[in-house]
Amino acid sequence: MTTQFSVAGIELELFRYPASQESNLQAWDAADEHLINSLIEGGQIAVPTAIINDSFGALSCALSRINPNWPLRVETDARTSFLGTEQNHHRNQLPMDNLQWFTSRDTLPKDVALVLMKLPKNLTYFAHQLMRLSQILPAGCRVLVGAKAKSINSSLLALFAKHLGPANASLAWKKTRVITCISDGKPRALPNGITWNIPEFNLTISNLSNVFAANKLDIGARIMLDNLPQGKFNTVVDLGCGNGVLGLRAAQLYPNADIHFIDDSEMAVASAKANWTMNQLAEGKGHFHWDDCMTHLPEDIEPDLVLCNPPFHQGEAITDHIAWQMFLDARRRLKNGGILHIVGNRHLAYHVKLQRLFKNCTTVASNGKFVILQAQK
């Protein structure tokens, strides 16, 4: 794994968060390098600068290295991005007092003079971000977006024109391009949220724009809902909760239990909380945590059931280290006799990991694509 970042005379040591031993993963990509090169070569750095979707702080660390006094407005939906950026600033002895933090639902201040962004995988979320920027940016403000060249096409440029202003793409460099968009100064109204029903479980679900499975139940969640464990549980964790559908169903099945919803996405946690209220579940029994797995979950919380539908990507990177961390956290936090109940694609072979960690693993249900596994501490 490469950790030495060197671009345009800027030298940094950058790590992913949480740390990964996978040799093909690093804390930045060529699009980060292209953005920084374009910015410096253009000689038109303007502050305050908003930095959006900066995976682990490569962009904010680079600008802080150039001038530690530049005010930066850092917006992220991922808790791991916040923690990784903080860690990399400390590691490189960079100040933090020039950073102002915003979640993906916060409104950036209207003093922003320049925006640096990475293109997220979820284009519905990206359109939402452009619309929010249209509400605060003056006409003529530049927005620079770094992305893989293969992700940039006429439809994406039309998305800019529709939601923020005219845009054009640079020449390719290391298979990336930088899109330059000029704000037209016309505020766009944000769309209403998506709401849909799961009648067989008497649930109504709403999703914010960066939450997986925007308007339907994904196949993994479907098989999981049909095969939740029977019994009495006092403390249940929906780990990687997304819109919270597993935890909501758990609240119906185990009405006396406290249900803890945890996700790396702030929008996911907000969606789960809204869904708890919308489905009129017991007040005081739902608890919501924006966290990197169970890293900061209070130590007095000892679950006897952890439900988990693990992701197998972090941003653009395909990886199983998040699932591995989830399983490790579950083993660490479950009370003795507690159960980890997961769903995953069959080809991911999660049974091998669970057998290694828990010394036991039972197949609860399966179909052609998915398998539900259970391990007991």
Swiss-Prot record:
Tell me which Gene3D superfamilies the record gives: Vaccinia Virus protein VP39
What EC number(s) does this enzyme carry? Answer: 2.1.1.174
* Any one of the GO BP annotations: rRNA base methylation
Give Gene Ontology CC terms: cytoplasm
Show the catalytic activity. Answer: guanosine(1835) in 23S rRNA + S-adenosyl-L-methionine = N(2)-methylguanosine(1835) in 23S rRNA + S-adenosyl-L-homocysteine + H(+)
* Enzyme class, spelled out: transferase
Principal cellular location given in the protein's record: cytoplasm
Its protein name is: Ribosomal RNA large subunit methyltransferase G
According to its UniProt entry, this protein's organism is Shewanella oneidensis (strain ATCC 700550 / JCM 31522 / CIP 106686 / LMG 19005 / NCIMB 14063 / MR-1)
